[in-house]
Amino acid sequence: MPELPEVEVVKRSLTYKIKNLIIKEVKINDDRLRYRIDKNKIRKIIGLKLEKIKRRSKFLLFFFNKNIVMLVHLGMTGKFFFIDKKNTKFKTSFYYNINNEKDKKHNHVIFFLNKKQKLIYNDVRKFGFIKFFKKKNLYDNLH
């Protein structure tokens, strides 16, 4: 399971790469994580700008305009990859390596961003999760 310092590293690397970018499209390859991804809620972030990323305990909190928050827990093996406009793939933590063939089958959610960039949620064991909340209800749902 990613320890707290690793989650902080992921937050910092993602903040640097995706802050102020807009979600153009979301592709769900497999919604069967620890909790199923709510497809109706994930569609609501399309067209929204990512304003900031925070960490609370081992949760990553992605704050979008329109007061929507995407809460992510990496579980045991969850990770993010960032692909820039030159199609260069970056990892967001130092605990794993990039292996395009091996990684591809575990890319569960792909967020297509403006400027032809992508954010990929990858989780081999599927113990992580992605949930959505209104900003005002967020802290009632953290446990």
Could you describe each region identified by the protein language model?
Residues 18-32:
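A short, Trp-centered hydrophobic/proline-enriched beta-strand micro-motif
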Residues 19-23, 43-51:
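A glycine-biased structural micro-motif
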Residues 31-40:
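Structured interface patches
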Residues 70-143:
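Phosphate/anion-contacting hairpin/loop surfaces
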